[in-house]
Amino acid sequence: MARMNRPAPVEVTYKNMRFLITHNPTNATLNKFIEELKKYGVTTIVRVCEATYDTTLVEKEGIHVLDWPFDDGAPPSNQIVDDWLSLVKIKFREEPGCCIAVHCVAGLGRAPVLVALALIEGGMKYEDAVQFIRQKRRGAFNSKQLLYLEKYRPKMRLRFKDSNGHRNNCCIQ
């Protein structure tokens, strides 16, 4: 079987959020994958595709793996969106400067969708979030995912008001 050329992992940073969008490793490429995660200070991986590797080595390195698979080319379920936004809010509040890695098979569809949702919830417009991610991850998103993101209405879960009732420009307080 021919080896697929996979895009390099890309870091997406917005306000106080840091994400690493990447493709899935295999057991054969796991050590290199772990090195890459450590280089970016990743403490949590969200795996949104079927498992292609054993998580034992990753967990031994202190990196928590969450399995939230959803169908390739499709938008995430409401439950996955809720879980994702809760994770983002908690991680960046409790571990400032940390990085959350997200991967699907190629890192072009499902993983970028979750990162785009976090950017939108953080105050970025849908079009800007798509362009911002595509500048770093060419080919990200298919037409069904773009339509989902266009219709997505932020719940303002990653924006807060200060004690005076003013919107705080900081994403998470």
Curated annotation (Swiss-Prot):
Its EC number is 3.1.3.48. Phosphate binds at V105, A106, G107, L108, G109, R110. The active site is at D72 (proton donor), C104 (phosphocysteine intermediate). InterPro entries: Prot-tyrosine_phosphatase-like, PTP, Tyr_Pase_cat, Tyr_Pase_dom, TYR_PHOSPHATASE_DUAL_dom. It holds the Pfam family Tc-R-P. A lipid is attached at C170 (S-farnesyl cysteine). Inhibited by sodium orthovanadate and pentamidine. Induction: Strongly down-regulated upon tetrodotoxin treatment. It is found in: Cell membrane; Early endosome; Endoplasmic reticulum; Cytoplasm. Substrate binds at R110. Expressed in bone marrow, lymph nodes, T lymphocytes, spleen, thymus and tonsil. Overexpressed in tumor cell lines. PROSITE patterns: TYR_PHOSPHATASE_2, TYR_PHOSPHATASE_DUAL. Disulfide bonds join C49-C104. Homotrimer. Interacts with ATF5. Interacts with tubulin. PANTHER family: TYROSINE SPECIFIC PROTEIN PHOSPHATASE AND DUAL SPECIFICITY PROTEIN PHOSPHATASE. Protein tyrosine phosphatase which stimulates progression from G1 into S phase during mitosis. May play a role in the development and maintenance of differentiating epithelial tissues. Enhances cell proliferation, cell motility and invasive activity, and promotes cancer metastasis. This is Protein tyrosine phosphatase type IVA 1. The gene is PTP4A1.
